[in-house]
Design a protein with these regions (language model features):
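Thiamine diphosphate
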Residues: 1-178, 185-337
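Short, structured loop/turn "capping" segments at alpha-beta junctions
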Residues: 178-180, 239
Length: 337
């Protein structure tokens, strides 16, 4: 184990997978130069958040490709390369701009295997950032994972720790289906122990962050640590929680969630997207439909409001679920009569 940041863990996975398989290559806006730096300039960034830094020095510009500012072109080129036998890892800087490449993802990459009767695969990864917390305003702060989770044929990964960032990205690159890989912008600098060498985390297998008896908390990405903070405060009141990080929203580890809710009898789902058609509503529907008789209290969903993400720091702070809101929701369901 080595302590690494979330960003370093992702970079580590890219180095390992590109060394392992010459068909793996990266592409996207400024994935080589970053912030407009010339390729040969020392200290270049490598992508807007520095994840691809250093890759071109080992693998060259044929496998590290800076692309024009065209999300449709990036996603379409990646899908075509995947059909031809390559394993592209494409980067869309912010998930807010995925609308510009929805046809390539929704009608092309997601459908190839089905439309060709299982004879074609599309082993591409589309890395993108999401989430509020950096005062980046409404066009650079959205969380659009529910949008692509709803599309059959796409797999969706959302690591919350450096170890899972490395393990899930390696798994995504080796997968024969298209994977949308969401990286929360506020997590790049967090640190944690990361396995050395090859590390694979299976899709569809949730992580049990902590165990308790009184309530089940389900969250992804940044919201996992918020749940941990809330659980620590709740422990002072004698309330203990299962915290489940699904890791992937598609495929989803339904059994882990349902088994926990059957045990605790209470469920709080935390997601920073707006409430309508959200990850939170999806999990709430799953539990209500499958383990309703085990519930001791109404299911609570802690989400952002049905609103664009505000720019003002104070308003953005109110938009995002907080440990305090989570703690209050758990207290409410535990004390429900």
């Amino acid at each position: 184990m080595t302590e690494k940041t979330y960003r370093e863990a992702l970079t580590d996975a890219l180095f390992l997978e590109m060394r392992r398989d010459e068909n793996v290559f990266i592409m996207g806006e400024d994935v080589v130069g970053g912030t407009g730096s010339p390729h040969a300039e020392p200290g270049f960034v490598g992508g807007v958040f520095g994840v691809t830094g250093g890759l071109h020095e080992e693998f060259g510009l044929e496998r590290c490709i800076d692309m024009p500012i065209s999300e449709a072109g990036i996603a379409g080129t990646a899908a075509g390369a995947a059909l031809a036998g390559k394993r592209p890892v494409a980067e869309i800087m912010f998930c807010d701009f995925m609308g510009l490449c929805l046809d390539q993802l929704m009608n092309q990459a997601a459908k190839f295997r089905y439309m060709f009767g299982g004879k074609a695969t599309c082993p591409m990864v589309l890395r993108t950032t999401y989430g509020a917390g950096m005062n980046a305003a409404s066009q650079h702060s959205q969380s659009l994972h529910p949008l692509v989770t709803a599309i059959p044929g796409l797999k969706v990964a959302m690591p919350s720790t450096p170890a899972d960032a490395k393990g899930l990205l390696s798994t995504a690159i080796r997968d024969d289906d298209p994977v949308i890989f969401f990286e929360h912008k506020t997590l790049y600098t967090i640190s944690g122990d990361v396995p050395d060498g090859e590390h694979l985390v299976p899709f569809g297998k949730a992580r049990m962050v902590s165990e308790g008896d009184d309530c089940t908390l389900v969250a992804t990405g940044r919201m996992v640590s918020f749940c941990e903070n809330a659980a620590q405060a709740l422990a002072d009141d004698g309330i203990t929680c299962d915290i489940i990080d699904p890791r992937t929203t598609s495929p989803l580890d339904e059994d882990a969630i349902l088994d926990s809710v059957e045990k605790t009898g209470r469920l709080v789902v935390v997601d920073e997207t707006p409430p309508r058609c959200s990850f939170a509503s999806d999990i709430a529907d799953l539990a209500a439909g499958e383990v309703f008789s085990s519930l001791k209290a109404p299911i609570k969903q802690i989400t952002g409001p049905h609103s664009p993400v505000p720019f003002a720091k104070e308003l953005e702070g109110e938009f995002v679920p907080s440990p305090t809101k989570i703690r209050d929701a758990v207290s409410e369901v535990v004390n429900f009569k």
